[in-house]
Structure formats: C-alpha cells, structure tokens
C-alpha cells in the first residue's frame, strides 16, 4: 500500500470516474486503474463497483475511502508543520469566497496579497457555502470566506468582520420618507431576493421573520437572482426594494445612495468569517490572508458592537 494508491482511491471516490480521477492526478487512466487494482488485490476486496455509472463505492470500500482521506490529511500535515515552524510563507494557498462577498474584496485582495507575499501563490475561486464545505472536506481547498457561524462538524471558524445590511428602494417607495427603517418596512410582496442556496437569502428572511407571508405576491411574476447587482437593477427597472450588504454600496453614485436606508438598532449584520477544516495547521498563511482582508474592510465593521444583531444563516421559512 502506498500514498499514491490512496490518492488515486480518493480521487476516484470524489469524481466517480476513473478518467476524471486520472486527469486530476495527472496520470494516464491505465496507470491509475492498475494501481487501484493492485491495492484491491492486496486488500482482498473491491473498493469500487465498476458496473455502475457513475462509479460507485462498495460497502467495504466506504470505510477504506474515509480512512484514506484521513491518512492523506495527516501526511499533508508533515509539510505544513515544517513550514509553520520555519514561519516561511510560501507555496500554494487555495481558498474560495461566497458570491455575496467576492466582488467586494477579491479584486483588490489578490494584487494586494501578491505584493505583500510574493512567494505565496493564491488560487482563488467563487463558490457557494455548501460547495466550499465539500471542497474543504475533499482536500480541494485550504480555506473559505463565508457567512458564519455555521457550526459545522470538523470546521473551524475565524470571524473577520460584521457587515450591516441596508435596504435599497425604488424612488416611489414610502419607506424613503424615513431616515432609519424597521424590518416591518421591508415589504415581502415587492422584495427582490437572492435564489435558494445563498446564505444571504435566509438572513433576509430571518430579518423579516414576523411577516414572511406573501413573498413577491405584489407582482405578476416571481424572480430570484444569483447576483446582488441584479437585485439592484430589478429595483431600478421594476420597482420595489431589495436588501444589500453594505460593501455592495461603497461604489454607488450619489443618486443611488439617496435610496439607501439603514435599519434602526439593533442593526442587522452578517458575520463574515474564514473557515478551515479542524486539521488545518498552516496558521501563519491563514493569518496573513486574514490580515490582508482586514485592511480592505472599514474599521467600523471589524468588531461586533452593541446595537447590532447577527442574522441567522439557517432559516426554516420559505
């Protein structure tokens, strides 16, 4: 049994295909198949049911695959521990950011980080929270920037900042007459929401928890978007309102800002944090990323303050 064989096993289990696994491992498919077959012969069991499409893990193979993942994670720790003790910031660091945060930090963060740490190669991507958690567990990512708290098993969380939510109204909405608004001013009949799968959608529904009936019933069609900027454009073109993270407004022109309203205390905020698996040890690299993100965030958001309410991510409503 070799580490390489275990890597091939985990790859096939992840991608459910010998061809895709070979591509990800940068070897030919016959080479990968031969090594897995040799391991199966040594163990005296079949790890995969090759008659099914996609490839399925056998009942005996399930436990072997999980143990292989654990062994590979422990092997990776050896290199990481050496780097941590040497305090040498180098190598590849793979992280992903959720779509409602990425546009407001990634463009500046990547160049800023590269200038500060030229020996570290960042691999950044944009994924939804569930995809980030899966990629972390599969060893495809080192960290993720998401809305927290998640309270997921085997996931560690490190808060980064607390971002207020604001409301953006069409020019004819009566709530614009107020300086500060209440959650009851958010009409779910006329709201534009992110689609299911986005944490921010659940947070907005949590904000309006006392009156969730009649979602988008005030118009002849229902539309939900995957992009915050699209929500703003729907308000501009079709009226109504939406709820935005404050960072999304920082480059708004003055006429857009006139239609932004903040909430009365307790001001609704989202906690944004960085997450890793519980076996991650490259803490110096993680801290360097956290430090660079912090430089991009207004000081007022860096700590949780009185008069703010962190909205829940999980919501049973709608």
In which residue ranges do the predicted regions lie?
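Hydrophobic two-helix hairpin corresponding to the core of helix-turn-helix DNA-binding domains
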Residues: 9, 21-22, 58, 113
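Short helix-boundary/capping micro-motifs
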Residues: 10-28
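A short LG(V/I)-centered, amphipathic sequence patch enriched
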Residues: 40-59, 79
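Alpha-helical linker/hinge and terminal dimerization helices associated
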Residues: 42-43, 64-86, 289, 293
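Central regulatory/effector-binding core of bacterial HTH transcription factors
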Residues: 90-153, 217, 224-227
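Hydrophobic hinge/microswitch elements
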Residues: 128-141, 146-147, 197-260, 307, ...
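Beta-alpha-beta core module
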Residues: 152-159, 163, 178-179, 185, ...
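Secondary-structure junction motif
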Residues: 190-213, 282-291, 297-311
């Amino acid at each position: 049994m070799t580490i390489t064989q275990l890597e091939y096993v985990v790859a096939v289990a992840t991608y459910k295909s010998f061809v895709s696994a070979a591509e990800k491992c940068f070897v030919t498919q016959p080479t990968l198949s031969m090594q897995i077959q040799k391991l199966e012969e040594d163990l005296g069991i079949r790890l995969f049911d090759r008659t099914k499409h996609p490839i399925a893990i056998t009942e005996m193979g399930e436990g072997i695959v999980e143990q292989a993942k654990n062994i590979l994670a422990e092997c990776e720790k050896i290199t990481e521990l050496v780097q941590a003790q040497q305090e040498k910031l180098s190598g590849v660091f793979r992280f992903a950011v959720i779509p409602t945060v990425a546009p407001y930090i990634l463009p500046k963060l990547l160049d800023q980080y590269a200038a500060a740490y030229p020996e570290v190669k960042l691999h950044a991507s944009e994924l939804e929270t569930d995809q980030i958690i899966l990629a972390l567990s599969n060893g495809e990512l080192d960290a993720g920037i998401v809305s927290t708290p998640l309270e997921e098993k085997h996931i560690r969380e490190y808060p980064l900042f607390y971002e207020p939510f604001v409301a953006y109204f069409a020019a004819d909405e009566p709530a614009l007459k107020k300086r500060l608004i209440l959650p009851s001013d958010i009409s779910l009949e006329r709201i534009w929401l992110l689609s299911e799968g986005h944490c921010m959608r659940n947070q907005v529904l949590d904000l309006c928890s006392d009156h969730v009936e009649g979602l988008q019933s005030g118009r002849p069609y229902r539309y939900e978007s995957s992009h915050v900027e699209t929500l703003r454009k729907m308000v501009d073109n079709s009226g109504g309102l939406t709820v935005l993270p404050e960072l999304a407004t920082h480059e708004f022109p003055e006429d857009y800002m006139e239609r932004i309203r903040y909430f009365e205390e307790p001001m609704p905020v989202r906690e944004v944090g960085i997450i890793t698996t519980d076996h991650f040890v490259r803490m110096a690299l993680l801290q360097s990323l956290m430090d660079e993100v912090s430089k991009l965030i207004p000081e007022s958001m860096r700590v949780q303050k009185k008069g703010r309410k962190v909205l829940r991510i999980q919501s049973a409503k709608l």
